[in-house]
Amino acid sequence: MAMRGDPKQRRASASAPHGGAAHHVADKLRRHSTFLLLLLLLWFALSLYLFLSATPPPPRPAFLPSTSTPRPALRIYVYDLPARFNRHWVAADARCATHLFAAEVALHEALLAYAGRAARPDDATLFFVPVYVSCNFSTDNGFPSLSHARALLADAVDLVRAQMPYWNRSAGADHVFVASHDFGACFHPMEDVAIADGIPEFLKRSILLQTFGVQGTHVCQEADHVVIPPHVPPEVALELPEPEKAQRDIFAFFRGKMEVHPKNISGRFYSKKVRTELLQKYGRNRKFYLKRKRYGNYRSEMARSLFCLCPLGWAPWSPRLVESVLLGCIPVIIADDIRLPFPSVLQWLDISLQVAEKDVASLEMVLDHVVATNLTVIQKNLWDPVKRKALVFNRPMEEGDATWQVLRELEILLDRSQRRHVESWKR
């Protein structure tokens, strides 16, 4: 007869399966809770990322200094020349640092504080030679003389060549000079004389930063060069109301030299008679505000104008180009074949009008057509703060300003030069 088991043992063995099931359920609940917690954390992190990605950063005022200017790859060594080549000129006449040719001073000062300035010449990509040739105000008409420019630059090059090996290493090809006057490094305000003189031989392999630029070939741009804007003090953009807020009660504005009886100077006429024709055609037209006399507060007149006329003088370029953009007045450029600074940024066709010299008689009709069709579009493009900033030389340099644009153009120029060198080597 089989023996019956102990009742306690039977209860224990009977209850064992139920206790294991409870532990199994509890373990499943813990794993499920952990999974839910991880899922919740993942959802929160993803939501936060999407929110931050979709939130635009607050806009930064256009003319405030940037605190995050990227450090450009370009390394520039600035020669420390004796003061007679630069600083003495500013000390002798304060106009040297502020007039329309003062880009040579502004660029020098900006590069001295530039984050990419090379402390050692061996680390440099380019070499900047700071010579101020536009500061000799000894002439009767108040404009600077350029008669000393070639000799002063030649002295600077001789000094650089004698004291350091870098000029001789490249024959000056990696050296940068500023030529911020009428016909660049030809150093004469009259085009026929400038062409006859040409660029000094010792500068022809160097890089020139010049206000002069025309389409096609020209003796005065027969060297690697970057077209830069004429100097206008950055404060101009801050002195008057923001362009979009200005009351514009002048239709078309010009104040400057307009000869009633143009003089024949060696077979050439000032402005190719364009300014004379403007005066003859529109001098009595009430829509045109044309004045021949100087006026210290002329920029306030520009700020009140829809269109600012920018006819050529002896040279095609004019500080009116920059002043017009800064003051929100549409530049009307009357200078055939002119090349303008920083075209990829300024997009000149979108912010200005270009009228052929031969079409001055049709100017009123052209301006009326713009008013009737796309005036607001042009003004919107023109009033972009990026455009204004690109034309002023800040000291120190700010991201996007004229010096910053010059460095960008120099990088492009170097890249193009290196590609040419590689391609010639491959041949």
Swiss-Prot record:
Q: Does the keyword Membrane apply?
A: yes
* Pfam families named in the record: Exostosin_GT47 (PF03016)
Which residues carry attached sugars according to the database record? N136, N168, N264, N374
Q: List, in alphabetical order, the GO biological process terms annotated in this UniProt record.
A: cell wall organization; glucuronoxylan biosynthetic process; protein glycosylation
TM region(s), chain numbering: 34-54
Starting at the broadest rank, the lineage of the source organism is: Eukaryota, Viridiplantae, Streptophyta, Embryophyta, Tracheophyta
List localization entries.
Golgi apparatus membrane
Keywords (alphabetical) are: Cell wall biogenesis/degradation, Glycoprotein, Glycosyltransferase, Golgi apparatus, Membrane, Signal-anchor, Transferase, Transmembrane, Transmembrane helix
Q: Which family does it belong to?
A: Belongs to the glycosyltransferase 47 family.
Q: How does it sit in the membrane?
A: Single-pass type II membrane protein
What EC number(s) are associated with this protein in UniProt?
Answer: 2.4.-.-
Name its species. Oryza sativa subsp. japonica
Q: Residue ranges, Cytoplasmic compartment?
A: 1-33
What biological function has been recorded for the protein in this entry? Involved in the synthesis of glucuronoxylan hemicellulose in secondary cell walls.
Could you tell me which residue ranges are on the Lumenal side of the membrane?
55-427
What does UniProt give as GO cellular component?
A: Golgi membrane
Molecular function in Gene Ontology: glycosyltransferase activity
Q: What is this protein called?
A: Probable glucuronosyltransferase Os03g0107900
